[in-house]
Regions:
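Contiguous beta-strand/loop segments that form the cofactor/metal-binding neighborhood of enzyme cores
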Residues: 96, 102-174
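Predominantly a Rossmann-like dinucleotide-binding segment in NAD(P)-dependent oxidoreductases
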Residues: 41-127
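Residues that form or flank phosphate/diphosphate-binding pockets in enzymes
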Residues: 19, 45, 157
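Short beta->alpha connector loops of Rossmann-like oxidoreductase domains
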Residues: 16, 73, 162
């Protein structure tokens, strides 16, 4: 759409591959149009507050960040024939379910490195083409370490969505 002179709003995920994401960015630059990915959690009052706290330095040095997302996604969500659960169309649990957590973390603390991960498919074999649970550990390029723990195998309902920040000036859990 940028080729036709339009600014574009893209629902998450922006792309499922680095190559596709780069195409979007390059088209935006080439045609001088804005492209926005829907990441509305940046505008929630708690997110705005914690961004102000981090940027102002009031929390001090960030030692650790822990993201937790434990949700229920069962056969009602992953209906056969739909895009949910299809690796090519859906991208996987981190793209569709937890990309907002990853965006908030990146927005607050910057890029990551030294990534190590473990994944499992506990409850969705036959329903999805990807894992439903995982642990991801990493370091922040600017210092500190972090982790993401997630699952869509929680029985009946969403259990937890949280961000724990451990700085030298206290602690914050959202």
């Amino acid at each position: 759409a940028v080729e036709t002179g339009c600014n574009v709003v893209i629902e998450k995920p922006m792309a499922l591959t680095l190559a596709d994401a780069e195409k979007v960015v390059y088209a935006s630059l080439k045609y001088r149009k804005q492209v926005f990915c829907v990441m509305q959690n940046r505008y929630s009052p708690p997110s705005v507050w914690i961004k102000e706290m981090v940027d102002s330095g009031r929390l001090g040095k960030i030692y650790m960040v822990q993201l937790n997302g434990y949700w229920n996604r069962d056969e009602r969500y992953y209906k056969p024939g739909g895009w949910h659960g299809d690796a090519v169309l859906d991208g996987g649990t981190l793209f569709t379910q937890f990309s907002h957590f990853i965006d908030i973390m990146y927005w607050l603390f910057g890029d990551i490195c030294n990534i190590q991960a473990r994944f499992a498919d506990f409850n969705h074999a036959g329903l999805t083409a990807f894992e439903d649970s995982g642990f991801v550990n990493f370091n922040f390029v600017n210092g500190g370490m972090g982790s993401l723990s997630y699952s869509t195998s929680i029985l009946n309902r969403k259990m937890e969505s949280s961000v724990l920040i451990v700085p030298d000036g206290g602690r914050v859990k959202l």
